[in-house]
Amino acid sequence: MALGLEQAEEQRLYQQTLLQDGLKDMLDHGKFLDCVVRAGEREFPCHRLVLAACSPYFRARFLAEPERAGELHLEEVSPDVVAQVLHYLYTSEIALDEASVQDLFAAAHRFQIPSIFTICVSFLQKRLCLSNCLAVFRLGLLLDCARLAVAARDFICAHFTLVARDADFLGLSADELIAIISSDGLNVEKEEAVFEAVMRWAGSGDAEAQAERQRALPTVFESVRCRLLPRAFLESRVERHPLVRAQPELLRKVQMVKDAHEGRITTLRKKKKGKDGAGAKEADKGTSKAKAEEDEEAERILPGILNDTLRFGMFLQDLIFMISEEGAVAYDPAANECYCASLSNQVPKNHVSLVTKENQVFVAGGLFYNEDNKEDPMSAYFLQFDHLDSEWLGMPPLPSPRCLFGLGEALNSIYVVGGREIKDGERCLDSVMCYDRLSFKWGESDPLPYVVYGHTVLSHMDLVYVIGGKGSDRKCLNKMCVYDPKKFEWKELAPMQTARSLFGATVHDGRIIVAAGVTDTGLTSSAEVYSITDNKWAPFEAFPQERSSLSLVSLVGTLYAIGGFATLETESGELVPTELNDIWRYNEEEKKWEGVLREIAYAAGATFLPVRLNVLCLTKM
C-alpha cells in the first residue's frame, strides 16, 4: 500500500513537472501566447490559462471583461514584482531578499496566490530582527496574516525594551500598541517600562497626532498593569504625569489602582446585549434573592487596569550559572534548586566566561580551525548565550588562540587579556584583544605593562582590573593594574599582600576580594580585600582549605566560593590534586565561611557566573 502511494506521488510530481516545463518552454518560444500583462512601461506576454489557474484574482478579471481578456493592466505594482510573480507561476522559482519581500508579499495577497504568500511569510518569520519586527507586524495586520502578525508580535514582546526605543514604535496606532502591551509574554522585568513606553508614544508626533493619541490613552491605559507598579512610583510618576493629570478619567483609573493596593477592589458590571437585557426585566419573579445575587456577582468583571498577572519577563531570578563542556546549569542557592539551561556541547573544555553589566553571557577559549583564514587558520571559540532560546550562539572567533587568559568588559567592548599562546613554545603574552559588541569585530587594544598568565580579570564601573598571575619567569606576581578605555591607558595600583595565581576573585559590595590560589611555595588558603576608593589591600577571612582555581561569585549581596583543586591524600597515602565540587557561603555577620553543599555534580570542570535568568525558559532538574 505504501509503495502504491509513493508511486502515485512520484507520477503526480512527474506530470506536474512535465506540465510546468512545457508551459515555460512555450512562453520562452512565444507559442500560444494570448495575453499581455502591462505594469508601468513594461509588457509581459503570457498565457491566460496559466494566470487563471494559479490566481482567483486573474480568473475573475478575465471572466469579468472577456472582450479585454487579452490585455491586463496592473496598477500600483512595480514591473520587477510582476516579473518575479510570473516567473514563479511558470517555474516555481522565486528569489527573495530583504528589499523585495514586502512588495512580493503584498502582490501575493492582492493576486491571491497562496504559495507565494506562504513563501514570503516563512522568509519574513525567519528574518525577524530588531530593525524590521515592527514593520513586519504592521504588514501582517494589514494583509490579515495572523501567522506573521503573531510571530512578529511575539518577537516584539521578547525584545520589548529595545523595540520600544525605536522611532517606528512611536508610529504604532493605538490598536497596534494595545495588541503588544496587553500580552502576558511581554519580556519586561518591571511594569514601569511599559508605562514609560506608553507615555512616550502618547506624547510623540505632531499636534494632531498627539491629540488623537491622548483621546485613545484611557483605552490604551487598560493594558498597562498599573497594579504591578510600586505604590511610590504610582504616586510620584504616574499620578503626576502631565498627560494623566489632564484627563479625569485617567485619574479615576489611578485611584482605582491605589484602592486596590489598600485591598479595595473595584469591579464593573458586565454589559448585557439585546434580548439578555430585555429578558432580565421579565425575569421570573419566583427567582430567589440568593440566586439573583449570585447572577449579579457573576456579571461583575475586573477592570483591565487592575490586571495583576505577571509578565513573562517578571520571572527573572538571580542564579549561579555553571558553564561546562557538558552543558550549562543554573543553581538557585536560596531554594537549593538546579535548572538546566543548555545541554549543548559547543563550549570548549578550557574556556573563560564573562557576564556583562547588561547580563550578557560570553565564553571564549579552546581551538577553532577557520578555513576562511588561509594565513592564520587557528583561532579560539567565542560564544554568546541566548537567554530566550537557551542556546549558544557562535560569534566571530577570537583571532589569537590562547590559554590561561582573562576576560573583562567596559564601554560595549570585551577584552581578552594576557595568557599563553597555544602554539609551540607557549609564549607568555602582554597583548590584549578587544571585541566591539556594536560592530561585531575583533581588534587589538593597548598591551599590558607586563606579560602575565594565570591571572584574574575583573570589570567594575567601565574599568578593567588585572590581578596577580605569573610572569615569563613562572614566578607568581602580586601586581595589580587597571585599564581605562576612555583614556586608553594602563595604570599600576597597589600590589596584593601575597603574590598568587589561579585564585578566586570577584567584586563584592564595591570591593575586590581574592581568595586561595597558587603561590611560589604551593597552595594557599589566604584571602585579602582591596578597597577601590582607597587603593589599599587588607587581610580577609581565609578560606577553610588550601586550593587553586577557586571560584568566587557575588550574588545578591552574598559571597559564594565554589569548587577548585586541593591536594588530598589517597588510600595509598599518595598526595594528588583533586577537583572539588562544593559550595561555600561567607557569613558577613560572623565573619566566617559556611558550607552550603558538599557536592554539586554540575560544577565539575565549570566556570561560574552570577546571572539573572528567566526560570520559565529553564527546565527544573
From Swiss-Prot:
Pfam families: BACK (PF07707), BTB (PF00651), Kelch_KLHDC2_KLHL20_DRC7 (PF24681). It comes from the Eukaryota. It is found in: Cytoplasm; Cytoplasm, Myofibril, Sarcomere, A band; Cytoplasm, Myofibril, Sarcomere, I band. Highly expressed in fetal (19, 23 and 31 weeks of gestation) and adult skeletal muscle; expression levels tend to be higher in fetal compared to postnatal muscles (at protein level). Also expressed in fetal and adult heart. GO terms for cellular component: A band; Cul3-RING ubiquitin ligase complex; cytoplasm; I band. Residues 265-295 are annotated as: Disordered. GO terms for molecular function: ubiquitin-like ligase-substrate adaptor activity. SMART domains: BACK, BTB, Kelch. The keyword Repeat applies. Residues 33-98 form the BTB domain. Substrate-specific adapter of a BCR (BTB-CUL3-RBX1) E3 ubiquitin ligase complex that acts as a key regulator of skeletal muscle development. The BCR(KLHL40) complex acts by mediating ubiquitination and degradation of TFDP1, thereby regulating the activity of the E2F:DP transcription factor complex. Promotes stabilization of LMOD3 by acting as a negative regulator of LMOD3 ubiquitination; the molecular process by which it negatively regulates ubiquitination of LMOD3 is however unclear. Belongs to the KLHL40 family. This is Kelch-like protein 40. The lineage of its organism: Eukaryota, Metazoa, Chordata, Craniata, Vertebrata. The gene is KLHL40.
